[in-house]
Swiss-Prot record:
Gene: tir
Region of interest: Disordered: 1-37, 184-204, 279-299, 313-347, 380-449
Taxonomic lineage: Bacteria, Pseudomonadati, Pseudomonadota, Gammaproteobacteria, Enterobacterales
Protein name: Translocated intimin receptor Tir
Basic and acidic residues bias spans: 184-196, 335-346
UniProt keyword Metal-binding present: no
Species of origin: Escherichia coli
NCBIfam families: transloc_TIR
Family in the record: Belongs to the Tir receptor family.
């Protein structure tokens, strides 16, 4: 493959003579045969520039590349490390971002520009900050991913192989994470996604969400009904007391009575004095004394008959006063008794109705609240949510070529086993992270084949969330050899054709990935333009 060396190799400190060109059978960039090979690294590993497409002199209107997000012509180069394994050439990205990814793992980092014009990427892990200097190609690639200029990115794991760290914008990974959470949250609904074109690789997804939960005691309407009944009873008692104090007949005063004997004596004495006074005014009512000369002189004493008459009239007046006193006392007592009886009747009626009903309401509300609380304590089940998700994958007939999973030395996986491996059971998840923290839901997707079998249930969820964006294909190879190659591109387009061609020509070997081969039709296949949003993974 025609290459251009970066000029240094951080893995080799000793001076090494220039290496000869790599075998011509691995030349996958046939359109760049006129480029010179300059290398001062070892034969097994060296840093280089690799042309992404057929030639760097492609037409200016060709905006697609095998790696979404890289700038268009003439900057379509990737800083890589090439390793020779037998007759197969395997490429790895090597640069500041790889150094930073090795230090901080799959986490957030930011890009800053220093005063001297250099660009640095800064990440943090376990309280330690790591800073690396970015090359112009790396900085341009990151700029193409971040048109908004937020300069915050996330390593999303080795999606294309253990040696290649994928990068996306932090806001995009947060959006993708939220979409995954939304997919996992139960909504007590049944969703069915019918399969699309049988040859498109789309699957039939059936989701059944069953949520069983018991509301808290405070959310039970029966409790609030009981409390409202108690409140109504208390209000009724207060209203009854106010009505008895204001609206009912007032309590009568004690009756005013007069002693009949005292009234008779008083009246008799008064009448006697009055009659005696009137009798003295008439001289005929007085006794007469005859003096020496024979003249009649009043003696100043009333005659006996007049005195008797006065006494009789005074006695009659006293008796009349006695009767009047007795009658007055009787009327006063009768009035008191009537008013008191009326008040007692009103009090009895109001107390029986007002306090009785209010007391019954309070008692009923208290019993209802107690029973409701007891039932909640007795019948409170553990809140549980069951989410059943069945994925039936309709594999196309040419699945090996479309997915790029051809294994030239291992047994072919049957469609039935692939469908069975895609059936999964997922339970709901909760989001307790703050908005300032970006968690990476794709951090564990770049795992070996044997580890992926235990967690195969997670991949359909991620693939469903990113059904339409440009995701890189995950390459899993059998055997004990480590996965050292990388594969980047858009599923279903040029990159799969490349792998199909390499598999048929023997360029793809067991346990190794990479872009190798000897045809021009594969590498010249145009891919779709990068999709904006959380799909931009490189």
């Amino acid at each position: 493959m025609p290459i251009g060396n970066l000029g240094h190799n951080p893995n080799v400190r000793a001076l090494i003579p220039p290496a000869p060109p790599l075998p011509s059978q691995t030349d996958g960039a046939g359109g760049a045969r006129n480029q010179l090979i300059n290398s001062n690294g070892p034969m097994g590993s060296r840093l280089l520039f690799t042309p992404i497409r057929n030639s760097v002199a492609d037409a200016a209107d060709s905006r697609a590349s095998d790696i979404p997000g890289l700038p268009t012509n003439p900057l379509r180069f990737a800083a890589s490390e090439v390793s020779l394994h037998g007759a197969l050439e395997v490429l790895h990205d090597k640069g500041g971002l790889d150094t930073l990814n090795s230090a901080i793992g799959s986490s957030l980092f930011r890009v800053e520009t220093r005063d001297d014009g250099s660009h640095v990427a800064i990440g943090q892990k376990n309280g330690l900050e790591t800073t690396v200097v970015l090359s112009e190609q790396e900085f341009s690639s990151l700029q193409s991913l971040d048109p908004e200029g937020k300069n915050k990115f996330v390593f999303t794991g080795g999606r294309g192989g253990a040696g290649h760290a994928m990068v996306t914008v932090a806001s995009d990974i947060a959006e993708a994470r939220q979409r995954i959470i939304d997919k996992l949250e139960p909504k007590d609904t049944k969703e069915t996604k019918e399969p699309g074109d049988p040859n498109s690789g789309e699957g039939k997804i059936i989701e059944i969400h069953t949520s069983t939960s018991t509301s808290s005691l405070r959310a039970d309407p029966k409790l609030w009904l009981s409390l409202g009944t108690i409140a109504a009873g208390l209000i009724g008692m207060a209203a009854t007391g106010i009505a008895q104090a204001v609206a009912l007949t007032p309590e009568p005063d004690d009756p005013i009575t007069t002693d009949p004997d005292a009234a008779a004596n008083t009246a008799e004495a008064a009448a006697k004095d009055q009659l005696t006074k009137e009798a003295f005014q008439n001289p005929d009512n007085q006794k007469v004394n005859i003096d020496e000369n024979g003249n009649a002189i009043p003696s100043g004493e009333l005659k006996d008959d007049v005195v008797a008459q006065i006494a009789e009239q005074a006695k009659a007046a006293g008796e009349q006063a006695r009767q009047e006193a007795i009658e007055s006392n009787s009327q006063a007592q009768q009035k008191y008794d009537e008013q008191h009886a009326k008040r007692e009747q009103e009090m009895s009626l109001s107390s029986g109705v007002g306090y009785g009903i209010s007391g019954a309401l309070i008692l009923g509300g208290g019993i209802g609240a107690g029973v409701t609380a007891a039932l909640h304590r007795k019948n409170q089940p553990a809140e549980q949510t069951i989410t059943t998700r069945t994925v039936v994958d309709n594999q196309p007939t040419n699945n090996a070529s479309a997915q790029g999973n051809t294994d030239t030395s291992g047994p072919e996986e049957s469609p039935a086993s692939r469908r069975n491996s895609n059936a999964s059971l997922a339970s709901n998840g909760s989001d307790t992270s703050s908005t300032g923290t970006v968690e990476n839901p794709y951090a564990d997707v770049g795992m070996p084949r044997n580890d992926s079998l235990a967690r195969i249930s997670e991949e359909p969820i991620y693939d469903e969330v990113a059904a339409d964006p440009n995701y890189s294909v995950i390459q899993h190879f059998s055997g004990n050899s480590p996965v050292t190659g990388r594969l980047v591109g858009t599923p279903g387009q040029g990159i799969q054709s490349t792998y199909a061609l390499l598999a048929s020509s023997g360029g793809l070997r067991l346990g190794m990935g990479g872009l190798t081969g000897g045809g021009e039709s594969a590498v010249s296949t145009a891919n779709a333009a990068p999709t904006p949003g959380p799909a931009r993974f490189v």
